[in-house]
Amino acid sequence: MRASQYLIATQKETPADAEVISHKLMLRAGLIRKMASGLYNWLPLGLRVLRKVENIVRQEMDKSGAQEVLMPVVQPAEIWQESGRWQQYGPELLRINDRHDRAFCLGPTHEEVITDLIRNEVKSYKQLPLNFYQIQTKFRDEVRPRFGVMRAREFLMKDAYSFHISQESLQETYDVMHRTYCNIFDRIGLQYRPVLADTGSIGGSASHEFHVLADSGEDDIAFSSDSDFAANVELAEALAPAKQTPGSSGAEEKHTPSQKSIEEVAAFLSVTPAQTLKTLIVLGETEDEGPAPLVALVLRGDHSLNDIKVSKLEGVADPLTFAPEERIKNELGAEVGSLGPIGLKITVIADRAAAACADFVCGANKTDYHLINANWDKEASYSRVEDLRNVVVGDPSPCGKGTIEIKRGIEVGHIFQLGTKYSAAMKATVLDENGKDVTMTMGCYGIGVSRIVASAIEQNHDDNGIIWPDAIAPFQLAIVPINMHKSDAVKEACETLYDQCQTAGIDVLLMDEPKARLGAMLADVELVGIPHRVVIGDRGLEQGNIEYKGRRDAESQEVAAASLFEFLREKIAP
């Protein structure tokens, strides 16, 4: 490609509304332009990157045996009502009516569409298993789109759906998809972690997310220092520590006026937050129309409550709901900041770490008073012990190897074992070997294609711009001439190299704009992130050398002009 015939819309200034580095650089490098909140135009440079990611995804999905289909973005309300998600999905589902006042939605996902398709096309267990995928535009009406294409309302996604006669068959395909995703991210050149995850609104049983590790990530990923274990913090198990041995003779009540938070109480009593317990009051489950019972959750003061874990506990309302402060004071006799597991007449669930504490500080269930040197089975008691908290750095890994480390991650892929959540609701059945109707078991597998582009930038950039992994760079090589339109020798050398690269299948950009300054061209090449570049000028040609620099290299090097093409062919991965 010749720069003189190509739109390279770079900018010197960073747009004020761009928050994360990928958003800033995608705008400055001329990859995207904002059209409206959460909606972006992809410019030629950006689209080249997007298509390269898409091609890698397609190639690996085809290798896995999945079959490509294409389903409509606009979906009829009936199939969403049939699955039960028309109301469940909430305002993120953009609902529209056509001229005949028939209800539709813009698809944020395609479980209903594919289930409707396959229940009408597949009739026998002999046709299974089957796995279908598409690379299609999705729309989710995010309440606050941000971070550019990282969290846009419209985005490009690869979604796949598999159908099975048994759980064993689903597990086989699930494992194939796990390996396929690893192959995809390896080929793109990303540092990533597959992690155990929650199934969320999609539903189902087993689930793994694939996270690109980056400081700007929205999710905390817990992983072992000595094994492959990794999980979203919301799902990582916090093991029980060794029980502490009480050393005091008995608890003592202390007046703690106006000390509400753990930090305030700990400082006032000259202890660390780890030596305190906090008691949180939530609503329990109820089967009648009366008020839900109160449930006390007790954690160590320096630990944070894990909403996902707690909402799955027997006896606790789902979704997790904190009790009103007025009700707490009326029924338990103390304000929130002074509560403790002391003589409570309600269910008390202690976290594993809290249950192992001794000589701790806790609320005395008397406003503005706390106990010091309290102990279980003496002053305090609990109904049962559960895992209630988020893991922290240094915790023992639940796999039994190493300790927990935590990094931020950007979710770029997610695989689910759906089971029969959708197939049962939509009566997607096949005849088994005995001629009986059996509900198909399903899996689904998503990759954020456009999000991968932003994630790659978050992981690969410097002060000068983007540093693309070779596999998805818009161009692999930039030829930067000095006075090409004034020197026949420079022009001939540039054109010869350009032709050689095109013949060899190397994506090459010739910076042939007649009025472009050398400094501006080099700055654009670095900003756009082209992995390899050469500078060709009269002086170098006279000496028989060409200047080469890799985007990740600190310094340039001289390469013999006669062997330049062979040098580049070895440098640039096919």
Swiss-Prot record:
BP-aspect Gene Ontology terms: prolyl-tRNA aminoacylation
Catalytic activity: tRNA(Pro) + L-proline + ATP = L-prolyl-tRNA(Pro) + AMP + diphosphate
Coiled coil: none
Location (main, coarse): cytoplasm
UniProt keywords, alphabetically: Aminoacyl-tRNA synthetase, ATP-binding, Cytoplasm, Ligase, Nucleotide-binding, Protein biosynthesis
Pfam families named among the record's database cross-references: HGTP_anticodon, tRNA-synt_2b, tRNA_edit
SUPFAM superfamilies: Class II aaRS ABD-related, Class II aaRS and biotin synthetases, YbaK/ProRS associated domain
The keyword Aminoacyl-tRNA synthetase belongs to this UniProt entry's keyword annotation: yes
UniProt-listed Enzyme Commission number(s): 6.1.1.15
GO molecular function, one term: aminoacyl-tRNA deacylase activity
One Gene Ontology term, aspect cellular component: cytosol
Localization per Swiss-Prot or TrEMBL: Cytoplasm
Family of this protein: Belongs to the class-II aminoacyl-tRNA synthetase family. ProS type 1 subfamily.
Quaternary structure, from the entry: Homodimer.
Domains (record comment): Consists of three domains: the N-terminal catalytic domain, the editing domain and the C-terminal anticodon-binding domain.
HAMAP family (alphabetical): Pro_tRNA_synth_type1
Described purpose of this protein according to its UniProt entry: Catalyzes the attachment of proline to tRNA(Pro) in a two-step reaction: proline is first activated by ATP to form Pro-AMP and then transferred to the acceptor end of tRNA(Pro). As ProRS can inadvertently accommodate and process non-cognate amino acids such as alanine and cysteine, to avoid such errors it has two additional distinct editing activities against alanine. One activity is designated as 'pretransfer' editing and involves the tRNA(Pro)-independent hydrolysis of activated Ala-AMP.
Name of the featured protein: Proline--tRNA ligase
Gene name for this UniProt entry: proS
